[in-house]
Design a protein with these regions (language model features):
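Short hydrophobic/Thr-rich beta-strand motif most characteristic of the beta2 strand and flanking loop
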Residues: 44-50
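Catalytic beta-strand/loop cores that center a nucleophilic Ser/Cys/Thr
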Residues: 131-179
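Cysteine-nucleophile active-site neighborhood
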Residues: 19, 63-137, 141-143, 201-203
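Acyltransferase
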Residues: 191-212
Length: 212
């Protein structure tokens, strides 16, 4: 694992074989859980806070994939995240959004982010999924930890986004773009209480060809 802070970004020295992940830190304590899980899987991770880099500089780093961390705000307050999601879509750069990052994916394509029916803080939920994308090879349902007060509104979900996981009541817990390598999970795979967190991240790394 190689960790880098918010110093001036360095382009990948070998564009053809670049395997670096760019993780956007939305000022959340779970960010480094994600970093450590990715490090367990052998990934090189560059970390930048959401207001300490612009989209042009982020894309100039030529990341093999982008991860949008959880955070305490909504997508409109998450620095470059919405614009970076659009840039990832334009360049077909694989992206994984976690919690706030998942909501950002939904909003970036026209979905609405609304108040959840209940605020959850460390609540376990059963994830019912289709076995695709980051959920490939996982049992359904499985238990995962939730910390959120916002959700992507199912009624406003655009056709280009597919629901890949949900709670029993239909609350969206996972999204995937139908044509692009863009994924989101509302829960926290990086929580020690979530089942199969490493495997979900490995599935994303397989997508961006970052070796374990």
């Amino acid at each position: 694992m190689v960790l880098h802070g918010s110093s001036s970004p360095k382009p990948c020295p070998n564009t053809k074989n670049c395997r670096m992940l760019l993780l956007i830190d939305n000022y959340d304590s779970f960010t480094y859980n994600l970093v450590h899980y990715l490090g367990d899987l052998g990934a090189e991770v560059e970390i930048r806070r959401n207001d300490q880099i612009d989209v042009q500089a982020a894309m100039a780093m030529n990341p093999a994939g982008i991860i949008l961390s959880p955070g305490p705000c909504d997508p409109d307050q998450a620095g470059i995240c919405l614009a970076l999601t659009a840039a990832a879509a334009e360049t077909s750069t694989p992206l994984l959004g976690v919690c706030l990052g998942h909501q950002t994916l939904g909003q970036a394509f026209g979905g609405k982010v609304v108040r959840a029916g209940e605020i959850v803080h460390g609540k376990m939920g059963m994830m019912h999924h289709k076995g695709q994308g980051v959920f490939a090879g996982l049992p359904s349902p499985f238990a995962a930890t939730r910390y959120h007060s916002l959700i992507v509104d199912r009624a406003t979900l655009p056709d280009c986004l597919e629901i890949t996981a949900e709670l029993e009541d239909g609350t969206i817990m996972g999204l995937q773009h139908r044509d692009l390598p863009l994924h989101g999970v509302q829960f926290h795979p990086e929580s020690i209480r979530s089942d199969h967190g490493h495997q979900m991240l490995q599935n994303f790394l397989n997508n961006v060809k970052v070796p374990a």
